Amino acid sequence: MDHVSHAAQRKFNSLNLLLLPWPTEIKPTDFRVVLEPPHNIAELAKNAVYQEFAPKREDASTFAARVDRALALACEQSGEIHGVVFPECALNVEQYLAVEKVAWRHGVLLIAGVQESGPKWGRNVVIVQPLGLIEKSDKRPNKKGLDSRLETTRLGQYKHHRWCLDRPQILQYELGGRLPASRHCWEFIDIEQRELNFLSLGDWLSWCALVCEDLARQDPTAEIIRSVGPSLVVALPFRARVHRRRAS
């Protein structure tokens, strides 16, 4: 269980989150079949393939400027923002590192779904960065540089389960031109050791974050969450699942 500093705990009795549905558009061409998966895995069943989300990413500095403007506008309208949240796989590593510093400058918590590239597998991670919220309330000097402080407080939690796109989903999301509807299309990510990060804000709020598929699966992780009983669970959905025909 990680704790926000005592100074922050004394100050906050509410939590205002800015939810940014990024990217604003996802196209069928952002998905592709992985033609050459790693050789050290068991042979896929004949009715399954791996699929990868591979969108064209905006330049990190341009994207960070967007987030900076969004936070400034949200503060104008709401008075105070304590955190900003991005969906599953919304950012790549470069975008995340840029936005992390924007969140710190605004003194807010950052929760983001980040897509990492690996030598073989991709990785899907939710990263929580509380440093902005901590240092906004705790003004004590710190001799460490900003990058070092960000690295110290950064909490990463890798996705526990692969997403499987079946025929109904492929057709519903109009991905039939990119993924074979006749086969199960499994998310091309590595499954790391399962971890859960719980955070507390004073004695009134405890919370954790989960990537979308991990909330749906009733496995030992769900039992742990029920045992801890956090007052808030932040679930990061995959933006593509909110298709225009389903939006409400």
Question: Whereabouts are the PLM-identified features?
Answer:
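Low-complexity, serine/threonine/proline-enriched polar segments
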Residues: 48-55, 134-195
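A short acidic (Asp/Glu
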Residues: 28-31, 93-101, 120-127, 219-222, ...
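Active-site beta-loop-alpha substructure in enzyme catalytic cores
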Residues: 76-78, 82-86, 172-248
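Short, structured patches in soluble enzyme cores that scaffold and shape functional sites
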Residues: 21, 130, 157-161, 211-213, ...
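Structural alpha-beta junctions
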Residues: 41-44, 104-111, 227-233
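Cys-nucleophile CN-hydrolase/nitrilase-fold catalytic domain and related Cys-dependent amidase chemistry
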Residues: 58-158
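Beta-strand-turn-beta hairpins that frame and shape the catalytic cleft
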Residues: 8-19, 26-28, 150-152, 194-209
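N-terminal, active-site-proximal structural segment of metallo-dependent hydrolase catalytic domains
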Residues: 1-83, 90
